[in-house]
Design a protein with these regions (language model features):
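Intrinsically disordered, compositionally biased charged tails
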Residues: 1-3, 226-279
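Ribosome large-subunit tunnel/peptidyl-transferase-proximal elements
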Residues: 1-233
Length: 279
């Protein structure tokens, strides 16, 4: 069963593309028709592509990996922040920090700096500083929070990137391509889909359009997280139900095997020395 449907996408305005003169020929397979100089996206293909992307995102979440959402355009920022946060995924809605992926260690240092400032604030270290110094540090902390606060929990490179508007976020897409990180994206008729692994052809300028697609994709991520949680509970239960002493017996057997191997090796060494003496 599909995670979305034609009518839902139609009502959200997902079918509206850009003016014909602004189109990217690579998007031709996803265009249904032209009306009043505007390209209309084939929503049947959008439904199929949403399902394809959602299934892949579910597996990524189920494996315990992170998906980084990227949307710095005004129409998408708020909805992306809400949807990504709802499934505990990192997101970037302010200016994309150049080198965020290709120079990830430097970004992590900035995040750690933010944590250090918090620690020094809590332990009273700043009580010995002047008001001016405290103000400077506070401003620095606020700037770091604005740009990097939403990725504070991203301790390693994400396993995928989900982008709203690949034309605007071309630097992020380029960095992901360079590192071999899969790119999921809502791609409008004016954009190039060639650098995107999972293309979702749809209107990327309307908040409602972005929202309905994120509902389906984040719903799949939530399912993956739930399945991972259930599997973990089952594994823990299986461990508790294992016969008492099973682990101990296994360790004892391992020690016995090792002792036996050492005894055999010692016997071989003794035999070798004896042969050497007789010679």
């Amino acid at each position: 069963m599909s995670r979305t449907n034609f009518d839902t996408l139609l009502e959200a305005g997902c079918h509206f593309g850009h003016l014909k003169r602004k189109w990217n020929p690579s998007m031709a397979p996803y265009i249904f028709m032209e009306r009043n100089g505007i390209h209309i996206i084939d929503l049947n293909k959008t439904v199929a592509k949403v399902d394809e992307a959602a299934d892949a995102l579910k597996q990524i979440a189920k494996s315990g990996k992170k998906v980084l959402f990227v949307a710095t355009k005004k129409q998408a920022k708020q909805v992306v922040a809400e949807k990504a946060a709802s499934v505990n995924m990192p997101y970037v809605i302010e200016r994309w920090p150049g080198g965020m992926l290709t120079n990830f260690p430097t970004i992590r240092k900035a995040v750690k700096k933010m944590a250090t400032i918090d620690k020094l604030t809590n332990d009273g270290t700043y009580s010995n500083l002047s008001k001016r110094e405290v103000l400077q540090i506070s401003r620095q902390r606020a700037k770091l929070e604005k740009n990097l606060g939403s990725i504070a929990d991203l301790t390693r490179l994400p396993s995928a990137l989900f982008v709203i508007d690949v034309l605007k976020e071309n630097i992020a897409v380029r960095e992901a391509n360079r590192l071999g990180i899969p790119v999921f994206a809502i791609v409008d008729t004016n954009s190039d889909p060639s650098n995107v692994d999972f293309v979702i052809p749809a209107n990327d300028d309307a908040t409602k359009s972005v929202e309905v697609i994120l509902d389906a994709c984040c719903g799949a991520i939530a399912e993956g997280l739930e399945e991972r949680k259930a599997e973990k509970v089952d594994m823990e239960a299986a461990g508790e139900n294992a016969p008492k002493g099973a682990g101990k017996k296994k360790n004892t057997k391992a020690r016995m095997d090792k002792a036996e191997e050492e005894a055999i090796n010692a016997a071989k060494a003794a035999a070798f020395l004896k042969e050497d003496e007789e010679a």
